[in-house]
UniProtKB/Swiss-Prot annotation:
Residues 388-408 are annotated as: Hydrophobic. Disulfide bonds join 317-379. This is Outer capsid protein VP4. Keywords: Capsid protein, Coiled coil, Disulfide bond, Hemagglutinin, Host cell membrane, Host cytoplasm, Host cytoskeleton, Host endoplasmic reticulum, Host membrane, Host-virus interaction, Membrane, Outer capsid protein, Viral attachment to host cell, Viral penetration into host cytoplasm, Viral penetration via permeabilization of host membrane, Virion, Virus entry into host cell. A motif (YGL motif) lies at residues 447-449.
Length: 775
């Protein structure tokens, strides 16, 4: 059966690479820090939308929604929407250039009969006739082209979000009109756009015109939830002013500061020393053939002085996107050949992960505006002698590339015990003189750097430069940033898992039911389960190891060892003096299950609660006493296998979490039954119990004493077709005793026959089980 995969994951021994353990320590180890926020802290949460990433020197990153700002008067810049959040009736804003453009927007609450109201606009008392027979607010845009003219209503916005917008762009003033959620923009001409100023009477926001689609979304649907909390305090518009400072080579600058957090700009010069690692593998035989010459990641630790401070640094150099070359001197055993040797040319990248023990790397968690400037370095290859048993030795000689800085991001370096947040510098390559060749062969005048001797007797290659970043750190320097190590790695994985969960849940509609039953009957092992993923056999083995490592911490794995005791205790704790009738056994609140099952009274509540607890343990009992019938875990594993094969996003990093979650979350509503002679006792995870005869499917009293005796000795059967479905099937179609018995035993062949006959009741039941396979 397909549930064999779960049994293998529970029972098989496995090995774990040291790198896997180190990666787990880095991503899961947490440190709890208690911080008392001061009186000026607006929220108790860490900031959102912070993350690692490269920002070029010439790039300015703007927020989508900047604000809120207090009511003010200013001359708005062009290409920026001013979004105003009106909270009362009256004047929302006034705008003019004192030449050919005067406009004022007034808010009118819902259900207002025609009435004349007095408004103070541009220092004058004006009377406007307003009305609003809508359930929404109305914003009347009153306009005049001269100070001598009277205002008239140019356009109206009917809105339930109480937001209005104004934009200076292209020689025109743009606003919104119509009715939400389908309000659109319209414009007014003016000959003097630059001098238009605005008087804002409510809180306002600033949105770049490049994000006009978001502005349209806010106008029609309202602000995001974080902007609707009273903890967000409006600031003065002057806070947008930037104080420019010329940064020194090595210094920390406080950009902003509150009682809890502060932004520190960190500027450092840096010396990067790195070395290439390689691996040379010789084939067996007579000694004339080599298997591979390849690049490997190499670590290097060193010390240097930075402004009089002794710095201990650690680098890891790796290569991505190598070119594979080969040389074959002939087919004889004594002909020299190299099956594969790697060469880096223009297309690969070299990555150097850098970490040092200075203060700059102590709180490198929330980082923005990360940039660096590094010089280039030329790497020239040396010679490598292929020592043949007889004859002249071929020599791979020469080759050169230059490394040019191409970007920087946050990364994680792994030591023997912990993971460290570090900087990853990316270098692009250009080929350089001299070319490389293999002397004594016809291979010559090739450009690039082969992996045979990339360091050329150099202890290291050195790159100098500087980097700058803005880091969010606790205001108190004695605090460590309260977040897990390697947070960026885990956040990336969580984003991948979120996307994968959505894809998995959407695939439920595409599963063919008849094929699912056939797949559920197959003995799925780890290789067949993961073989649908596009990968090599070695990667499949690695994925299976990762899945087992994750699965051992699942709720299913931790519960299986305690199954016997917990099942026995839970069963014996139920009262043995009361029988329960099915139709009165449903209790609405099953969440308050007692942790101490020994303190049980004879009340109906306690019996039903214990029954619900027992039903959750029956899955574990079923797994170790498998019958010939189909189980919920067979369907769960079959659906999981189908979705893995159909998925386009599954990978080595996400597979362990998905398999573990599937074992715990697929088909949460289950029913299990015990069969004794001609009577069936059925119980589900919601605490409902049924007892009925096989011949008539009529209910009989549920005997707790009998159930407690049978549960430890009789096999447990998954109620794929539960009692209600059986009853419905018999009432509408009529079934024989043999058919009923086979359905009670979850016979897969009988289930397949009903599905092939397109029986709507059975098909609907199976469809509901498939739809329960969600993460």
């Amino acid at each position: 059966m397909a549930s064999l995969i779960y049994r293998q994951l529970l029972t098989n021994s496995y090995s774990v690479d040291l790198h896997d353990e180190i990666e787990q320590i880095g991503s899961e180890k947490t440190q709890n820090v208690t911080v008392n926020p001061g009186p000026f802290a607006q929220t108790r949460y860490a900031p959102v939308n912070w993350g690692h990433g490269e920002t070029n020197d010439s790039t300015t990153v703007e927020p989508i929604l900047d604000g809120p700002y207090q009511p003010t008067t200013f001359t708005p810049p062009t290409d920026y929407w001013i979004l105003i959040n009106s909270n009362t009736n009256g004047v929302v804003y006034e705008s003019t250039n004192n030449s050919d453009f005067w406009t004022v927007v007034v808010a009118v609450e819902p259900h207002v009969n025609p009435v004349d109201r007095q408004y103070t606009v541009f220092g004058e008392n004006k009377q406007f006739n307003v009305r609003n027979d809508s359930d929404k607010w109305k914003f009347l845009e009153m306009f005049r082209s001269s100070s001598q003219n009277e205002f008239y209503n140019r356009r109206t916005l009917t809105s339930d979000t109480k937001l209005v917008g104004m934009l200076k762009y292209g020689g025109r003033i743009w606003t919104f009109h119509g009715e939400t959620p389908r309000a659109t923009t319209d414009s007014s001409n003016t000959a003097n756009l630059n001098d238009i100023s605005i008087i804002i009477h409510s809180e306002s926001y600033i949105i770049p015109r490049s994000q006009e689609s978001k502005c349209n979304e806010y106008i029609n649907n309202g602000l995001p939830p974080i902007q609707n909390t009273r903890n967000v305090v409006p600031l003065s518009l002057s806070s947008r002013s930037i104080q420019y400072k010329r940064a020194q080579v090595n210094e920390d600058i406080t950009i902003s500061k509150t009682s809890l957090w502060k932004e520190m700009q960190c500027n450092r010069d840096i010396i990067i020393r790195c070395t290439f690692g390689n691996s040379i593998v010789k084939l067996g035989g007579l000694g004339y053939k080599w298997s591979e010459i390849s690049y490997k990641a190499a670590n290097y630790q060193y010390n240097y002085l930075r402004d009089g401070e002794q710095v201990t640094a650690h680098t890891t150099c790796s290569v991505n996107g190598v070119n594979n070359f080969s040389y074959n001197g002939g087919s004889l055993p004594t002909d020299f050949s190299v099956s594969r040797y790697e060469v880096i040319k223009e297309n690969p990248y070299v990555y150097v992960d850098y970490w040092d023990d200075s203060k700059a790397f102590r709180n490198m968690v929330y980082v923005r505006s990360l940039a660096a400037n590094l010089n280039s370095v030329k790497c020239t290859g040396g010679s490598y002698n292929f020592s043949l048993p007889v004859g002249a030795w071929p020599v791979m000689n020469g080759g050169a590339v230059s490394l040019h800085f191409a970007g920087v991001t946050l990364s994680t370096q792994f030591t023997d015990f912990v993971s460290l947040n570090s900087l990853q510098f990316k270098f692009s390559l250009t080929v350089d003189e001299p070319p490389f060749s293999i002397l004594k062969t016809l291979t010559g005048n090739l450009y690039g750097l082969p992996a045979a001797n990339p360091n050329n007797r150099n202890e290291y290659y050195e790159i100098s430069g500087r980097f700058s970043l803005i880091s969010l750190v606790p205001t108190n320097d004695d605090y460590q940033t309260p977040i897990m190590n390697s947070v960026t790695v885990r956040q990336d994985l969580e984003r991948q898992l979120t996307d994968l969960r959505e894809e998995f849940n959407s695939l439920s509609q595409e599963i063919a039911m008849s094929q699912l039953i056939d797949l559920a009957l197959l003995p799925l092992d780890m290789f067949s389960m993961f073989s649908g993923i596009k990968s090599t056999i070695d990667l499949t083995k690695s994925m299976a190891t990762s899945v087992m490592k994750k699965f051992r911490k699942s709720k299913l794995a931790t519960s299986i060892s305690e199954m016997t005791n917990s099942l026995s205790d839970a069963a014996s704790s139920a009262s043995r003096s009361v029988s329960i009738k099915s139709n009165i056994s449903t209790i609405s609140n099953w969440t308050n299950v007692s942790n101490d099952v020994s303190n049980v009274t004879n009340s109906l509540n306690d019996i039903s609660t214990q029954t619900s607890t027992i039903s959750k343990d029956l899955r574990l009992k079923e797994m170790i006493t498998q019958t010939e019938g189909m189980s919920f875990d067979d369907i769960s594993a079959a659906v999981l296998k189908t979705k893995i094969d159909m998925s386009t996003q599954i990978g080595k990093n996400t597979l362990p979490d998905i398999v573990t979650e599937a074992s715990e979350k697929f088909i949460p509503k289950r029913s299990y039954r015990i069969l004794k002679d001609d009577e069936v006792m059925e119980i589900n995870t919601e605490g409902k119990v049924f007892a009925y005869k096989i011949d008539t499917l009529n209910e009989v009293p549920f005997d707790v004493n009998k159930f407690a005796e049978l549960v430890t000795n009789s096999p447990v059967i998954s109620a794929i077709i539960d009692f209600k479905t059986l009853k419905n099937l018999n009432d509408n179609y009529g079934i024989t005793r043999i058919e009923a018995l086979n359905l009670i035993k979850s016979n897969p062949n009988v289930l397949r026959n009903f599905i092939n006959q397109n029986n709507p009741i059975i098909r609907n039941r199976i469809e509901q089980l498939i739809l329960q396979c969600k993460l």
